[in-house]
Design a protein with these regions (language model features):
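Short catalytic-loop micro-motif centered on adjacent basic/acidic residues
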Residues: 1-2, 25-27, 120-123
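Conserved AMP-binding
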Residues: 3-8, 125-127
Length: 146
């Protein structure tokens, strides 16, 4: 799935790779319709520049900040446990159980908003802020620096 113009140097390079490996390429109608287009295309990989992921980070955080009570605690646990897993830290039994809840109640819902099949976001054309990459991975959106 892509939304960058074909004239963009990163997108141009990625297009060649996609052609070489025989991948299907879906083009979003516009940046505003990207998420709804992802629901239709159900992409497995999406490439974009760091600015896209910064905006996504901001929007997800704005949504998280609106939550309160149990939802807010579950979101915080999702982030904390996701970061521990990313750093390959051992989870206690209680954390493993909570993480299962986070997977079903938070991460799965987030992944479904992006079509449900997303295997990886790939950021390229510049450096992705490490905190943004960690955050996206922690909430269930595997993000790689290309």
């Amino acid at each position: 799935m892509t939304w960058l113009p074909l004239s963009h140097s990163y997108e141009h390079t990625v297009q060649f790779i996609q052609i070489i490996v025989g991948a299907k390429v879906f083009y979003a109608e516009s940046l505003e319709k990207l998420i709804s287009n992802m629901g239709v295309a159900k992409p497995t990989i999406m490439t974009a520049v760091p600015r896209f992921y910064q905006n996504l980070f901001t929007k997800i955080n704005m949504n998280f900040e609106k939550q309160s009570g149990l939802k807010r605690k579950l979101i915080n646990q999702t982030l904390n446990l996701g970061k521990k897993i990313l750093k390959k830290e051992e989870l206690k039994l209680s954390e493993k159980i909570i993480n299962l809840l986070c997977e079903k109640l938070v991460r799965k819902k987030i992944r479904n908003q992006f079509g449900g099949n997303l295997q990886a976001f790939v950021s390229g054309g510049g450096a992705l802020d490490q905190n943004i990459g960690e955050f996206l991975n922690a909430v269930g959106l595997p993000t790689l620096q290309g």
